[in-house]
Swiss-Prot record:
Pfam families: Ndh2_N, Proton_antipo_M. It is a multi-pass membrane protein. GO terms for cellular component: chloroplast thylakoid membrane. GO terms for biological process: ATP synthesis coupled electron transport; photosynthesis, light reaction. It catalyses: a plastoquinone + NADH + (n+1) H(+)(in) = a plastoquinol + NAD(+) + n H(+)(out); a plastoquinone + NADPH + (n+1) H(+)(in) = a plastoquinol + NADP(+) + n H(+)(out). InterPro entries: NADH-Q_OxRdtase_suN/2, ND/Mrp_TM, Ndh2_N. GO terms for molecular function: NADH dehydrogenase (ubiquinone) activity; quinone binding. This is NAD(P)H-quinone oxidoreductase subunit 2 A, chloroplastic. Belongs to the complex I subunit 2 family. PANTHER family: NADH DEHYDROGENASE. The lineage of its organism: Eukaryota, Viridiplantae, Streptophyta, Embryophyta, Tracheophyta.
Length: 510
C-alpha cells in the first residue's frame, strides 16, 4: 500500500516536471531557436550514426555544418529585436549576447572543414568528434546568454567537459593523455573556486541568483562594500581566469596546445576565449557594479602579466603550437583592455572587433599548421625553413596570418589593435596601452623570425621534412585549404574596410 502511494506520487511529480518543461519550451523555446537548431542537429547525428554504415560519413559533416549555418541564419534574422528574458530569468536575449553567440558559431563553422582531412588521416572517430564540437558550441552559446549563477556555472561545464574529451581524443598519444589530465585537474579546481565565489555572492545578496537581482539584493542587505564581496570577486576572477587563460592562470595552456590534436587546439583557442569574455563582461559589469575600481585593478594586473609573460616566453619556443599558446596568452591581455574600458569609449565594440579579427588570424594560422603537419608530420619551427621553395601558397598564407597577429599594417590585426588601444587611451589606461604597444613590438619579432625561416631558408638549413615535402594540387577540393583561404582573406581585407565593421559593432551594442 505504501509502495503504491509512493509510486503514484512519483508519477504525479514526474508529470508536473514534464508539463512545466514542455510549457517553458513551448512559450520560451522561440527565444533559443538557434540553440534548438544545434540540438536537433545533434539528435540527427546520433540517429544517422546508429542506423547507417561508414559510407554516410559525408552526411555527418554536411549535417554538422548545415546546423551551424542555419543557427547563424536564425541569429541574423533575430537581430535588433528587443531584449528578452526567458526561462524564469535564467536566459537573456539581446544584441550584446547574440554578437558573441555569432562569433562562437563562426568559430565552429570554420573549424569543422579544418578538421575533416585530419580526422580521416589520423583515423579518429568522426561522429563523436562532431558531437563534442557541437555540444561545446551549444554550451558556449548558453553561457553567452546566461543570466543567473546556476546557468553561468552549468553552461561552461558543458563546454569544458567536451573540451577535456576533445583534448584527449588521440588516446594512444602519451602527450595527449598528459594534456588531458592537466586540463581536467586544473579545470575541476577552477570550477570549484568559481562556485565558492558564487556562494559568497549568493549569501551577500540575500539568496539571489539572477545577476540584476543580486545587485538589488546587495543594496537591500547593505553588503555591496563588505569584505564578502571582495572575497567573491577574487575567487570568481580566479575561476574565470582559467577559461580566459591570462597569466598567471595560463599553466595549462601550452601543454594542452602541444598535446591535443591540432584542429582541437584551433577550436579551443578561439571559442573558449569568446565565451569566457562574454561571461566576464556580464559578471564584472552587473553584480560587481559597486566594486568597479577593485575589479578594474585586478584585470589590469592580469592584462599586464599576460602581455609581458605571454610575448616574452613565446620567443623561446621551438614548437609552433606552444608558440601560439603563449601568443594567445598575450592576445588575451589585449582583449582584457576592452573589458576594462567597458561601455564607455567603445570598449566593448573594440573588444568585439578585435575578437572577430583574432578568430580569422588564429584559425588561419592553425589551418596552415594542420596542413603542414599532415604533409610532414612535424610541428617544430625549424622544420618550416625553406617552405616557400616547396609550397609558396602555404608559406604566403602563414606569413600573412602571422603578420596580422603581430599587428602590421595594412592587415586586419593592425587596425583591430589600433582601435582597441585608442579606446584604452581615451579611457585613461595609458600604462596598459604603452605595455600593449611594447609587447606588440616583441610579438612582431618572433613572428618575423618564423617568416624569415619560411622565405629565406638556405639549402643547408632545410630539414628532410621540407626537402621531401609533397604539395597536393588545389583541384583536390582540400577542405583545410578552403578554411585557410577564407581566414587569410578575412585577416587581410577587413583592415582596409575597417569603418563598416566598427559601425556594425557600435550599432549592435548601443
Amino acid at each position: 500500500m505504501i509502495w503504491h502511494v509512493q509510486n503514484e506520487n512519483f508519477i504525479l511529480d514526474s508529470t508536473r516536471i514534464f508539463m512545466k518543461a514542455f510549457h517553458l519550451l513551448l512559450f520560451d523555446g522561440s527565444l533559443i531557436f538557434p540553440e534548438c537548431i544545434l540540438i536537433f542537429g545533434l539528435i540527427l547525428l546520433l540517429m544517422i550514426d546508429s542506423t547507417s554504415d561508414q559510407k554516410d560519413i559525408p552526411w555527418l559533416y554536411f549535417i554538422s555544418s548545415t546546423s551551424l549555418v542555419m543557427s547563424i541564419t536564425a541569429l541574423l534574422f533575430r537581430w535588433r529585436e528587443e531584449p528578452m528574458i526567458s526561462f524564469s530569468g535564467n536566459f537573456q536575449t539581446n544584441n550584446f549576447n547574440e554578437i558573441f553567440q555569432f562569433l562562437i558559431l563562426l568559430c565552429s563553422t570554420l573549424c569543422i572543414p579544418l578538421s575533416v582531412e585530419y580526422i580521416e588521416c589520423t583515423e579518429m572517430a568522426i561522429t563523436e568528434f562532431l558531437l563534442f564540437v557541437l555540444t561545446a558550441t551549444l554550451g558556449g552559446m548558453f553561457l553567452c546568454g546566461a543570466n543567473d549563477l546556476i546557468t553561468i556555472f552549468v553552461a561552461p561545464e558543458c563546454f569544458s567537459l567536451c573540451s577535456y574529451l576533445l583534448s584527449g581524443y588521440t588516446k594512444k598519444d602519451v602527450r595527449s593523455n598528459e594534456a588531458t589530465m592537466k586540463y581536467l585537474l586544473m579545470g575541476g579546481a577552477s570550477s570549484s573556486i568559481l562556485v565558492h565565489g558564487f556562494s559568497w555572492l549568493y549569501g551577500s545578496s540575500g539568496g539571489e541568483i539572477e545577476l540584476q537581482e543580486i545587485v538589488n539584493g546587495l543594496i537591500n542587505t547593505q553588503m555591496y562594500n563588505s569584505p564578502g564581496i571582495s572575497i567573491a570577486l577574487i575567487f570568481i576572477t580566479v575561476g574565470i581566469g582559467f577559461k580566459l587563460s591570462p597569466a598567471p592562470s595560463h599553466q595549462w595552456t601550452p601543454d594542452v596546445y602541444e598535446g591535443s590534436p591540432t584542429p582541437v587546439v584551433a577550436f579551443l583557442s578561439v571559442t573558449s576565449k569568446v565565451a569566457a569574455s562574454a561571461s566576464a563582461t556580464r559578471i564584472f559589469d552587473i553584480p560587481f557594479y559597486f566594486s568597479s575600481n577593485e575589479w578594474h585593478l585586478l584585470l589590469e594586473i592580469l592584462a599586464i602579466l599576460s602581455m609581458i609573460l605571454g610575448n616574452l616566453i613565446a620567443i623561446t619556443q621551438t614548437s609552433m603550437k606552444r608558440m601560439l599558446a603563449y601568443s594567445s596568452i598575450g592576445q588575451i591581455g589585449y582583449v582584457i583592455i576592452g573589458i576594462i574600458v567597458g561601455d564607455s569609449n567603445d570598449g566593448y565594440a573594440s573588444m568585439i572587433t578585435y575578437m572577430l579579427f583574432y578568430i580569422s588570424m588564429n584559425l588561419g594560422t592553425f589551418a596552415c599548421i594542420v596542413l603542414f603537419g599532415l604533409r610532414t608530420g612535424t610541428d617544430n619551427i625549424r622544420d618550416y625553413a625553406g617552405l616557400y621553395t616547396k609550397d609558396p601558397f602555404l608559406a604566403l598564407s602563414l606569413a600573412l596570418c602571422l603578420l596580422s597577429l603581430g599587428g602590421l599594417p595594412p592587415l586586419a590585426g593592425f587596425f583591430g589593435k589600433l582601435y582597441l588601444f585608442w579606446c584604452g587611451w581615451q579611457a585613461g589606461l595609458y600604462f596598459l596601452v604603452l605595455i600593449g604597444l611594447l609587447t606588440s613590438v616583441v610579438s612582431i619579432y618572433y613572428y618575423l623570425k618564423i617568416i624569415k625561416l619560411l622565405m629565406t631558408g638556405r639549402n643547408q638549413e632545410i630539414t628532410p621534412h621540407v626537402r621531401n615535402y609533397r604539395r597536393s594540387p588545389l583541384r583536390s577540393n582540400n577542405s583545410i585549404e578552403l578554411s585557410m583561404i577564407v581566414c587569410v582573406i578575412a585577416s587581410t581585407i577587413p583592415g582596409i574596410s575597417m569603418n563598416p565593421i566598427i559601425a556594425i559593432a557600435q550599432d549592435s551594442l548601443f
